Regions:
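N-terminal secretory signal peptides that target proteins for export/translocation
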Residues: 1-20
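Intrinsically disordered, low-complexity regions enriched in polar/acidic and amide residues
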Residues: 4-5, 38, 42
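N-terminal compositionally biased, intrinsically disordered segments and leader/signal-like regions
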Residues: 9-15, 30, 37, 183
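Bacterial N-terminal signal peptides
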Residues: 22-36
Length: 332
C-alpha cells in the first residue's frame, strides 16, 4: 500500500482517511485471515457487522479458487444484482488476450464514480500467489452485499469509489491452476522469453515425469546422500544430522534436458516478474532479475499504469500478495 501524504499540519489527507476506512473494511470482513467469514455479530457504533450476509443476492462460495470465466460470471452477477452499486468491465488485455477485469464499486446514485476519492485494489500479480484474487473479489462482493445492511458501508460507498482488479495476471494464474506446477512456479506470465540465450524460447520447461499433475522434487538413493525419508510422510525429506548417515540425494524438480545443452529446466515458461516491470526504480535484467526489457514492456503492467494515471481521483492503493504476513507501506 502506498502511504498517504500528509498536509502541512501533519494530519492525514483524504488518501490517509480513505486508506484507514478501507482498512476497516479489510479487518471487518476477515480478509487478512483469508476470508474466514463467521456469523453476523452485533457490535457497538459504526462497526456493526462481521462476516458475510446470511442471504446474499449473489451467492458465492469462498472455499475455492475461481478461474477467469468464473470471475467474469461473479462480476456480471454483481452488476446485475446491484446496478446502482457495481460496474463490471476491463482495464485491458493480457498477453494471451484475456480481459483484466475491473469492478467499480460505489453508490452511482450519489455522484460520479470518477469524481469521488477512490481506493485502488488489485491482487495476484504473481501467478502462484492466487489468494490475492479471491481477497480482492470478496471485497467487491462484501461491499455490494452489505451496503444495505451496515450504515458505515453505505456511507463509504456514498462518499468513495473502489476500483478493484482481482488479478493483474490472468494468463499466469490460468497456467498455475490448470497445468502441473511447483508451489513457486510459474511466478511470471506466459510470454515466451529466451532465458538461456540460445535463440530458443521456453524450450526447457519443467516436465511432469510421472503424470500425477504435480511437479515435485526428484530423489535418488545414495549412500553419500544427506537426506532421509520422513517417518510421518514418505513424500517429505529430512536432512540427516551430522552424526547420522543419509540415504538419498536431491536431484531437483522433475524434468528432462529437453534441448540437450547439459542443463535441466533452465528455460521455463517466461521468465519475467511483472512486479519488477514498474517504472519506479526500474533496473535492467542483469541488476534486477525478472525486470524484462524495459519498464511497462508487459501489457498487464501497462494496463494498470494507464488506468491509474487516467484516474486522478485515486487517493490510495492496496495490492495483495501472499506468504509475507505483513503490510508494506511505501515512503512518502
Amino acid at each position: 500500500m502506498r502511504r498517504a501524504p500528509e498536509d502541512t499540519n501533519g494530519t492525514s489527507t483524504t488518501a490517509g482517511r480513505l486508506v484507514a476506512r478501507v482498512a476497516a473494511v479489510i479487518a471487518m470482513t476477515g480478509l487478512a485471515a483469508l476470508m474466514t467469514a463467521g456469523p453476523a455479530v452485533a457490535q457497538a457504533g459504526a462497526l456493526a457487522a462481521l462476516g458475510s450476509p446470511p442471504d446474499p443476492k449473489v451467492p458465492v462460495s469462498w472455499d475455492r479458487y475461481y478461474d477467469h470465466a468464473a470471475v467474469e460470471d461473479i462480476g456480471r452477477r454483481l452488476e446485475e444484482a446491484y446496478p446502482d452499486r457495481c460496474r463490471f468491465g476491463s482495464i485491458g488485455k493480457s498477453y494471451e488476450g484475456r480481459d483484466i477485469w475491473l469492478l467499480t464499486v460505489t453508490n452511482f446514485r450519489v455522484g460520479e464514480a470518477d469524481r469521488k476519492p477512490a481506493m485502488y485494489i488489485d491482487g495476484n500479480i504473481h501467478s502462484n500467489e492466487i489468494q490475492g484474487q479471491e481477497i480482492a473479489l470478496y471485497t467487491a462482493w462484501y461491499l455490494c452485499e452489505m451496503a444495505d445492511r451496515v450504515p458505515w458501508v453505505s456511507d463509504l460507498l456514498d462518499d468513495r469509489t473502489m476500483y478493484i482488479v482481482p488479478t493483474i495476471n490472468p494468463d499466469g494464474r490460468a497456467a498455475f491452476i490448470d497445468s502441473p506446477n511447483t508451489p513457486s512456479s510459474p511466478r511470471s506470465g506466459v510470454a515466451p522469453r529466451d532465458d538461456d540465450g540460445d535463440g530458443l524460447f521456453d524450450e526447457d520447461d519443467l516436465d511432469d515425469l510421472n503424470g500425477d499433475g504435480h511437479i515435485t522434487m526428484m530423489r535418488r538413493r545414495d549412500p553419500n546422500g544427506r537426506w532421509l525419508v520422513s517417518r510421518e510422510d514418505p513424500r517429505l525429506m529430512i536432512r540427516a544430522r551430522p552424526d547420522e548417515p543419509g540415504e538419498y540425494e536431491i536431484l531437483g524438480y522433475e524434468g528432462f534436458d529437453n534441448d540437450n545443452d547439459g542443463r535441466v529446466n533452465e528455460d521455463r515458461t517466461g521468465y519475467y516478474d511483472p512486479n519488477r516491470n514498474w517504472p519506479w526504480l526500474w533496473q535492467p535484467q542483469y541488476v534486477q532479475s525478472g525486470a524484462d526489457a524495459y519498464p511497462t514492456s508487459l501489457p498487464e503492467t501497462r494496463a494498470v499504469i494507464d488506468f491509474v494515471v487516467n484516474h486522478e481521483n485515486i487517493a490510495g492503493a492496496q495490492t495483495y500478495h501472499n506468504s509475507g504476513g505483513m503490510i508494506l507501506r511505501g515512503p512518502g
